[in-house]
Design a protein with these regions (language model features):
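N-proximal low-complexity "stem/linker" segments adjacent to membrane-targeting elements
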Residues: 1-63, 67
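C-terminal catalytic/acceptor-binding lobe
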Residues: 2-22, 194-300
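Active-site nucleotide-sugar/metal-binding loop of Leloir-type enzymes
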Residues: 70-83
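Short beta-strand-to-loop acidic/aromatic patch adjacent to the donor-nucleotide binding site
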Residues: 80-92
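Short, Asp-centered acidic motifs that coordinate Mg2+ and/or phosphate
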Residues: 83, 112-114, 249
Length: 300
């Protein structure tokens, strides 16, 4: 990725107010993370303050995420909203980052029909942590290593950026991205359905989706093995089929999302002793530890 100079952005509120956002969250078991809730409350407040229409839709107790996403789309298409915004219940974001995404989409709706934010997988790439730690750039703030410790949920578009370099302060084209934070224009689903009539089906879980008996909906999201023998998750399958329609998938590298989850903490005193590592917090390290966790930051 290449860097460019940052600049202040004047939101195009007139264009943004013409949008109607349908924020949908599949929420298995009716559960979400506190950080998701905080982000949602901040976002709702911002949207109301700026006069941008937004409604919320939650789908509880659907264990199959593919079916849940298709139900969300079906209910979105019944509404008058212009854009479906998928945000998963384990994602945390800054409200102003979402406002900026909305601004970009509103500025050029025809171009940015699919816009996504990138978030890390629920894993720690220890080799990346080791490489970053050896660089010496984190000696004064070791907790910042968590910012470079993961693999992101997307695949780059190598044809668009053959040299492997892309700007990070403007939207970039990607091959595939996760649906956990994705804004999609209504027309994308309309073109998708027209191109794939074979994906129409009758939903069987009528209670969860508020469907009438015999009603037909589309499987926009499903897991498949494609013609290159790749196993595609439902979000990557969606991206692949959308790109075949000539619609680009755009991502915003500069916004920061958190992917909430659980982690198993391990510790072995014998190994600590062998490496000369303190079993408890060392006194000389206390002053070096500075909290850099986003949920402790004030909204900018």
């Amino acid at each position: 990725m290449t860097q460019t100079e940052t600049k202040n952005i004047q939101l195009n509120l007139e264009a943004m107010r013409k949008m109607h956002i349908y924020l949908a969250t599949p929420m298995y078991g009716g559960q979400c993370y506190g950080l998701y809730t905080k982000s949602l409350m901040d976002t709702t407040s911002q949207m109301m303050n700026y006069g941008i229409p937004m409604e919320l839709y939650y789908l509880f107790n659907e264990s199959l995420v593919t079916r849940a996403r298709n139900y969300c789309v079906a209910n979105f298409l019944k509404s008058s909203a212009t854009h479906l915004l998928f945000i998963d219940s384990d994602i945390s974001w800054k409200a102003m980052d979402l406002m900026y995404m909305t601004h970009l989409v509103a500025e050029d709706t025809d171009k940015y029909r699919v816009m996504t934010g990138l978030y890390p997988k629920k894993t720690i790439a220890w080799e990346k942590v080791l490489r970053a730690a050896k660089s010496g750039n984190y000696d004064e703030n070791p907790m910042a290593l968590e910012k470079v410790a993961g693999d992101m949920v997307f695949n780059p578009d190598h044809k668009e950026y053959p040299e492997g370099r892309a700007p990070i302060f403007e939207p970039v084209k990607v091959r595939e991205a996760g649906t956990g934070f994705m804004m999609i224009h209504r027309s994308v689903f309309e073109e998708y359905a027209e191109a794939h009539p074979e994906l129409e089906y009758t939903p069987d879980h009528l209670r969860e989706g508020d469907f009438k008996t015999g009603e037909k909906i589309h499987a926009y999201f499903d897991c498949i093995i494609n013609d290159q023998n790749r196993y595609l998750s439902e979000d990557y399958m969606f991206c692949e089929n959308v790109r075949k329609l000539g619609i680009d998938i755009w991502a915003l590298p500069m916004i920061e999302l958190m992917h909430c989850g659980s982690y198993i903490y391990q510790g072995k005193l014998i190994d600590m002793a062998a490496q000369g590592v303190h079993a408890t917090m060392a006194a000389d390290d206390i002053g070096k530890i500075r909290s850099s966790r986003p949920y402790e930051d004030n909204e900018k």
